[in-house]
Amino acid sequence: MSVRRAARIGDAWLIVNTSGLGKVAPLMQTYRAALKEYGRTPMEFPITVECYVGAHYATAHEECRGPLEYKYNAYASWGLQDRSTQGSFEDFARDRFIIGDKVSVKEEIARYRELLGVDHFIMRCQWPGLPQERVLDSIQRLGDIFA
C-alpha cells in the first residue's frame, strides 16, 4: 500500500484530498501505524485541499461551483475522478473541499486537524474560470482567519 511505503521511505505523506475524508481518514490511520512500525517521525503532516472563503456562507458554494465543477469534470474525462455518479455539487464538495465563510472555514480546518492530525495546509484557491478578484478576496479572508 502506498501510504505504508510513504511511511517507510518518505519524509511525509502529502495528502491530496480529492477522494474525501471518508477515504483519507482510514489511510491516515494506516500511515500513522506504519510510521510507528518503522520508527519514523515526519517533520509535518501536510494536506492539500481546495479552499474558497466567501464573504457569506450562503453564497460561497455558488461563487466557486462553476470553476470547481469544470476542474473536476476535466479530471473525470481523463479517468481520474468519477463525477457522473455524484449528486449535487454540495454533496461532492462535502469532506473534500473547504468552502464557506471565515467562521465555517476556520471550523473545517479545525475539524481536519482533529480528524487527521494534519498540521500543514496547502490551500488551492485558484481554478480556471474563477475571476481574479474573487481569488484575491478569498485569499485575503483566508489570511484574516489566522491573522
For each feature predicted by the language model, list its residue ranges:
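Active-site-adjacent structural elements that line small-molecule/cofactor binding pockets in enzymes
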Residues: 1-147
